[in-house]
């Protein structure tokens, strides 16, 4: 009888046990600081992860939350080196069992790029959530604290598993593959225009309205576990009166791949087409 009671107690304890969520901080506006609460100008990446966590003590009611400082930058300065560091740390934490979910605080300038990169290289179906803010931490009516609270709620929610890397801002949950920043200042900036959001989170209450069916994370073919660097890939935008010498310069600078963002339905200027074909013939 005692053994049965003990087993029941263990079972009940497992049901009420809080999940473990690790916050990996990289800086951004969510960690930004201004001279005053009404200052539009601020410096991104000024506050450490411990300060961000202490600012929202309620997250400890949702999960056992720990933080690590991976970087503290404005996300316009994001690098391949930080990407690899993030990817390897996320995979390490999720594989070890030390984390049931991951939250990454990030600047909004390149948040969607980091989210999609991780969507391709994370090898787990556990929740990985990127979160940012459009107003600095010292701003009047800062959006960061509630965004962080909601992001931890999403990462701790079992229904988030298997949806790939997620982006949470302004009460919305977006799939990394679809989301993009659409406005330079509005808190309602992140949108998935082709598919729409896949869920909502309202003061910690998580509700999914769609399922991410695209291949991602553990089903992705990409693996960076043995890589120390990523190859250089450049983006070339097309425009009227375009020149092909930009492509030639990129090849000389060591570009290993070129993405051409064409006009209309991917159209390429004749002069650029010549240099792109030459680049391709050279192995780019």
Regions found by a protein language model. Name each.
Residues 4-13:
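Sec-dependent N-terminal signal peptides
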Residues 37-46, 110, 116-129, 144-150, ...:
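A glycine- and small-aliphatic-rich helix-loop capping segment at beta-alpha/alpha-beta transitions
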Residues 96-111, 253-265:
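Short acidic, glycine-rich surface-loop motifs adjacent to enzyme active sites
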Residues 104-126, 268-277:
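Short Gly/Thr/Asp-enriched flexible loops that form oxyanion-binding sites at enzyme active sites
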Residues 131-203:
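Internal gly/pro-rich beta-alpha loop/helix module
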């Amino acid at each position: 009888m005692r053994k049965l009671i003990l087993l029941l107690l263990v079972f009940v304890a497992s049901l009420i046990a809080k999940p473990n969520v690790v916050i990996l901080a990289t800086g951004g506006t969510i960690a930004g600081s201004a001279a005053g609460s009404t200052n539009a100008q601020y410096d991104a990446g000024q506050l450490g992860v411990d300060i961000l966590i202490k600012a929202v003590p309620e997250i400890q009611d949702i999960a056992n939350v720990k933080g690590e400082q991976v970087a503290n930058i404005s996300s316009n300065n994001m690098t391949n080196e930080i990407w690899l560091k993030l990817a390897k740390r996320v995979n390490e934490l999720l594989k070890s069992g030390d984390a049931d979910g991951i939250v990454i605080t990030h600047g909004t300038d390149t948040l969607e790029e980091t989210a999609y990169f991780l969507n391709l290289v994370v090898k787990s179906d556990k929740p990985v959530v990127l979160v940012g803010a459009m107003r600095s931490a010292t701003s009047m009516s800062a959006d960061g604290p509630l965004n962080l609270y909601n992001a931890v709620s999403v990462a701790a929610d079992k229904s988030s598993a298997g949806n790939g890397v997620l982006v949470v801002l302004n009460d919305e949950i977006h799939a990394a593959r679809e989301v993009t920043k659409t406005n330079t200042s509005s808190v309602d900036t992140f949108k998935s225009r082709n598919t729409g959001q896949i869920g909502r989170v309202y003061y910690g209450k998580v509700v999914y309205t769609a399922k991410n069916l695209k291949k991602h994370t553990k089903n992705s073919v990409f693996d960076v576990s043995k890589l120390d660097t990523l190859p250089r890939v450049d983006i070339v935008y097309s425009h009227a009166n375009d020149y092909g010498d930009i492509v030639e310069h990129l090849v000389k600078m060591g570009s290993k791949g070129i993405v051409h963002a064409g006009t209309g339905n991917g159209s390429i200027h004749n002069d650029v087409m010549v240099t792109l074909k030459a680049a391709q013939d050279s192995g780019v």
